[in-house]
Amino acid sequence: MKLSFIGGGNMAQAMVGGLLAKKSFRADQIFVADPDAKARAKVSRLLKRGGQVSASVRDLRGLGSLVILAVKPQAMEAACREGLADRLRGEAVLSIAAGIRLDSISRWLKGHARLIRCMPNTPALIGAGITGAFARPAVSRAQRNLAQRVLQSVGKVVWLDDEALLDAVTAVSGSGPAYFFWLIEQLEAAGVALGLAPGVARELAIQTALGAAKLAARGKDSPASLRERVTSKGGTTEAALEVFAREALGERFRKAVAAARTRGTELGDILGKDA
């Protein structure tokens, strides 16, 4: 069983590295095509002497059982039309490009139906991501399982029954890391304003976020229960949360996430147009 990556950028490199580290695939089972010499050099270092790395999909010895489209959204149409469309037979095609709908990819691939679309996030670059995925009905169970193996190389995977929900996934987990980075920034700034040294404030904010996430990830208690456990009646945490409530922070946050979802839908309309 072999895989081919069309695009060898950061996310493709993370997946290749994860697959090799977990011994899910050998280097000689992985093919990568990317016109950028620097990207090819990085992938080649990962694969060492195994697999094949080329400048064009036309030069690959084969496509394997799964083709991963790992190019930027703006380059997706060209990647599909130039060399790939004419080589596809029964392979499954997995797109990790944000915003590009499967209707557009199918059109650029001359009606190819075995398509999977997913939305990873940046923590995937360190193997700690989560990916939302949707598979069209023509994708076989074996092909879906193969896609799952690939995506699990960089974190967890959740499958959706409706492609349109990927816009919500993008708003929650795709953009989500930025929300948490912003919150860390604010907590750090608040600590500095209270007299803490910047380095100390940053370390406190980051480790608190990390520890809280680990507690929540255990799944034994809901985030609400964990919050209530920290919040003593008349205490310091309650004083802070009362300010959040007065300022309607929760409602504003939900509006922000909804705005991200709306923009994702708009970008799908824009990016899916033929050049």
Show the residue positions of the predicted features.
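NAD(P)+-binding Rossmann beta1-loop-alpha1 motif at the extreme N-terminus of oxidoreductases
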Residues: 1-62, 66, 192-194
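Hydrophobic packing residues within well-ordered alpha-helices of enzyme cores
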Residues: 15, 19, 40-43, 79-83, ...
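Small-residue helix-packing motif on alpha-helices
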Residues: 30, 40, 60, 197-204, ...
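Rossmann-like NAD(P)(H) cofactor-binding subdomain of soluble oxidoreductases
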Residues: 31, 47, 57-133, 137
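Internal alpha-helical scaffold of NAD(P)-dependent oxidoreductase catalytic cores
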Residues: 104-114, 130-168, 179-220, 263
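Short pre-catalytic strand/loop immediately N-terminal to key active-site residues, enriched for Gly-Thr
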Residues: 165-171, 223-228
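NAD(P)-dependent Rossmann-like dehydrogenase/reductase catalytic/cofactor-binding core
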Residues: 206-275
